[in-house]
Amino acid sequence: MKKKLSKLTALLLSLTLALSIVPVWADSPSVSVYLDGHFLSHTDARPYILNDRTMVPIYQLAQALGCDVGWDGATKTVTLTRAGDTVKMVIDDPTAYVNGKPVAMDVAPTIMEDRTMIPAAYVAAFFGQKVEWDGETRRVYITEDKSVAEGSNLEAWALPMGSMLAQLDHGKPDCFGLYARSVAGIGLSNKLPYAECRKILSSSWSIKNRDDLIGTVISMTFSGHNDNFRGMAADVKLRSQAEREAISAASSVWPLYMWEYTEYVDEKWGDRGILCWDLFRMSNLVQWGYTAGYITYEEALALIEPAATLLCENFSSWEEAYENYLDGYNWWARNDVLGKDIWQTSRGKTYQTIKQNYGSIFQDSLFETGVIPLPGLSVEDVIATLPS
């Protein structure tokens, strides 16, 4: 957050100069806000210019960024929280409090036609976004400030790792975060991206907040289902065919043992087990967590680094890694595909579709280059933010 505040003054000064010739809302044409290159729709109130600042409905921008929004009617205080950071603003007060520290703004939040309007540039910058103004088109462009990852290739690792579930869950395999943050709705649920990601994390993973997410990601990276597989594979080696048949005959869940397939996968991959089944889903958790507003972009990449390193150390191409993933998925799902072409299974075909449509994200050269970490944040730094 200190880095964000240090950049804020210069950024907002440049925007002030750019907007200085723009009239106020009552006398000016409409203003459009774009997030990650896509129009940010407004349903209840349109953006306008106030004191050379673009004012937007609070929910329009805050929810797109994955913020939780709180309102204290008694004090007229708006509270925005995202990824461990908190911003408080009071209606008609030009001082914001960012993690408790006062920051002077040259325009205050206001209420217009029963809608709380906030200064887009300040709020976006408080949460690590880059803001640009195009005076000719009267557009505000907000994007993730990815300069924090300058020189790192962790996003290039993350995209192919998370591409399978991005494809299956109506997302975008070539978009970090799996969904475009500005889209109106996702799939059949028609939920906003941040809400859809929170739903997935909660219903499928029992992850309801930042701490849950970070803890689960760390656990999955270094243990996960691969530990279960390797334990079962070791057990298979100790049992004779007669013992296997006796156990199966006495059990009502005999298909779950999958003796032959477990043995086959173990012999095929050795100590690697079903490593990619865990690592690839971990990338999904991290990207969902980013879009949900639980972690920042920089934190998401830091959390991916250990998984990307394990992947790079154990595999030499994306096709090899995805073959391991497919074996892991079918073992976990108890799909006995022994003797079948793994690439003709449902997810095998999905992988081929992804490669056909998003082939540029599958760069085998990464396995030669290796993992290039972030310049200013490590996974240990992220873990240190958890309660002791």
Language-model features: where?
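Polar/charged low-complexity regulatory segments
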Residues: 147-297, 301-388
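Primary recognition of N-terminal secretory signal peptides and signal-anchoring hydrophobic helices
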Residues: 2-150
